[in-house]
UniProtKB/Swiss-Prot annotation:
Protein EC: 1.15.1.1
Cofactor: record remark: Binds 1 copper ion per subunit.
Keywords associated with the record: Antioxidant, Copper, Cytoplasm, Disulfide bond, Metal-binding, Oxidoreductase, Zinc
Record localization: Cytoplasm
Name this protein carries in UniProt: Superoxide dismutase [Cu-Zn]
An MF annotation (GO) of this entry: copper ion binding
Length: 152
């Protein structure tokens, strides 16, 4: 079992911890708790870079080793880092579990050292018709992020 963690930081009062685990070459399970967000859906993605020197803006685009368009987690045509939305309750918190086979913790396309980003708006899953739908899901600003680091 390989495990990883990302501790979210934010200039907007958002905080949280995201845990990743993978057994063998099976799918990766992502569990998280995030607080300080407005209620509703928020885009949730793995971005290509683990660089937070300029806050969440320096994490680069969505992790996309196959060079595909943005999409929903269940789509064949999607960025590997497209994890859809997290649902935030009226109290500003979200607790979630996501299982995904395109974000391994080992191998050539490992997400270790990359960043996880929570966005300010819902991800339209590439289907919104907006000019940004096929690249970012039109998910708005980057309100929190953390670098995915290996856990012992």
């Amino acid at each position: 079992m390989v495990k990883a963690v990302a501790v979210l930081s934010s200039s907007e009062g958002v905080s949280g911890t995201i845990f990743f685990s993978q057994e063998g070459d099976g799918p990766t399970t992502v569990t998280g708790n995030v607080s300080g967000l407005k209620p509703g859906l928020h885009g949730f993605h793995v971005h290509a870079l683990g660089d937070t020197t300029n806050g969440c803006m320096s994490t680069g685009p969505h992790f996309n080793p196959a060079g595909k368009e943005h999409g929903a987690p269940g789509d064949d045509n999607r960025h590997a880092g497209d994890l859809g939305n997290i649902t935030v309750g009226e109290d500003g918190t979200a607790s979630f579990t996501i299982t995904d086979k395109q974000i391994p913790l080992t191998g050539a396309n490992s997400v270790i050292g990359r960043a996880v980003v929570v966005h300010g708006d819902p991800d339209d899953l590439g289907k919104g018709g907006h000019e940004l739908s096929k690249s970012t899901g039109n998910a708005g600003g980057r309100v929190a992020c953390g670098i995915i680091g290996l856990q012992g």
